[in-house]
């Protein structure tokens, strides 16, 4: 006899999430005391934090990327560290190293800047691959080995890496396999005119608002657990899988014209991260269940770095965003 699926009390889940997500508004208001505009970037940082993921931000210098994660760490009363990636950086500069202590005639461990709740990897594409992979391994494993000892990293642990657009000289592009480890890749644009006017005024005054801790690290860890309880219907799961499979086998979804443009589609990590990001987005919107609009809201940030383009696509100036938008327009919404 087949086991009957348990009935889900969506109303109870919704009430619980509505109560537990109340801090999001407080946190956003606190961050907005310093960050003008850039709502999309702040929202994506929160999704990364709640979904235990990491965020890759791409944009020209001077768009408040560093300020955003620093402000978030202050509002959450977490430890913050910044790593400026340069061509001469070594893996030990990121994760830490053993230092010889002459007095004790022994080696002591010096932990690197990766031991913090919020780590800013500034201009990650300016350092060689071995340094990039040292950080990305720490992100994936949530632990670091120095000498013979293995150390767990702090919780919560959010890495926000920034990257200048690849056209700029002196950069080492992140390999596809490494980029795939980022839950989200967000492209940051210039602020609107009225926002920039406000930025200029506040900078000229020189009076910056003090950021107060409004959420504890413990509350964030509890919220990360609550996000997993956000209800996702089977129809939404199927919708996510259809989108992912359409990036791999477009011909199955009457998208034959995309086949010559895609060299590889999104991996299962893409499916997991799309589902997680949709749950986080619902949580931020103080809802205990996922709707198709949640999936569509995060889809570009989750998938833009997971689809490989052929030379043909590049020659025609077709981007991964164009492909995602075509797929979303064709896949039936539940």
Task: List each model region and its residues.
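Pre-Walker A (pre-P-loop) alpha-helix and adjacent loop at the N terminus of AAA/AAA+ ATPase modules
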Residues: 17-63, 245
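Canonical AAA+ ATPase core
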Residues: 101-105, 123, 127, 131, ...
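P-loop (Walker A) phosphate-binding loop of NTP-binding proteins
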Residues: 60, 94, 162
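Conserved alpha-helical scaffold flanking the Walker A/P-loop in AAA+ ATPase domains
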Residues: 44-47, 100-120, 149
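C-terminal engagement/docking regions of AAA+ P-loop ATPases
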Residues: 1-17, 250-334
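Walker A/P-loop
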Residues: 49-86
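Conserved C-terminal "switch" segment of AAA+ ATPases
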Residues: 13-21, 34, 171-172, 185-257, ...
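Walker B catalytic acidic pair
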Residues: 59, 122-123, 134
């Amino acid at each position: 006899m087949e086991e009957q699926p348990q009935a889900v009390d969506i109303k109870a889940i919704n009430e619980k999430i509505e109560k537990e997500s109340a801090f999001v508004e407080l946190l956003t208001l606190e961050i907005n005391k310093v960050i003008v505009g850039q709502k999309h970037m702040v929202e994506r940082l929160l999704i990364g934090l709640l979904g235990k993921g990491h965020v890759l931000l791409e944009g020209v210098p001077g768009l408040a990327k560093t300020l955003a994660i620093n402000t978030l760490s202050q509002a959450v009363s977490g430890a913050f560290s910044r790593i400026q990636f340069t061509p001469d950086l070594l893996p030990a500069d990121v994760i830490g190293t053993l230092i010889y202590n002459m007095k004790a005639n022994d080696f002591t461990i010096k932990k690197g800047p990766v031991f913090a709740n919020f780590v800013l990897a500034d201009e990650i594409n300016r350092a060689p691959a071995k340094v990039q992979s040292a950080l990305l391994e720490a992100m994936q494993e949530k632990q670091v080995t120095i000498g013979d000892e293995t150390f767990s990293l702090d919780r919560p642990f959010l890495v926000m890496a920034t990257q200048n657009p690849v056209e700029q000289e002196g950069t080492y592009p992140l390999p596809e396999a490494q980029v795939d480890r980022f839950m989200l890749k967000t492209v940051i644009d210039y602020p609107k005119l009225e926002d920039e006017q406000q930025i200029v005024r506040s900078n000229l005054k020189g009076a910056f608002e003090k950021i107060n801790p409004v959420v504890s690290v413990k509350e964030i860890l509890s919220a990360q657990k609550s996000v997993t309880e956000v209800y996702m219907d089977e129809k939404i799961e199927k919708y996510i899988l259809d989108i992912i499979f359409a990036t791999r086998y477009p011909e199955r979804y009457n998208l034959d014209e995309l086949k010559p443009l895609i060299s590889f589609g999104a991996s299962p990590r893409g499916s997991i991260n799309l589902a997680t990001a949709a749950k986080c987005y619902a949580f931020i919107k103080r809802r205990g269940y996922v709707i198709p609009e949640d999936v569509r809201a995060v889809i570009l940030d989750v998938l833009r770095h997971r689809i490989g383009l052929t030379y043909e696509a590049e020659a025609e100036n077709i981007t991964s965003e164009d492909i995602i938008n075509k797929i979303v327009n064709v896949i039936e919404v539940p």
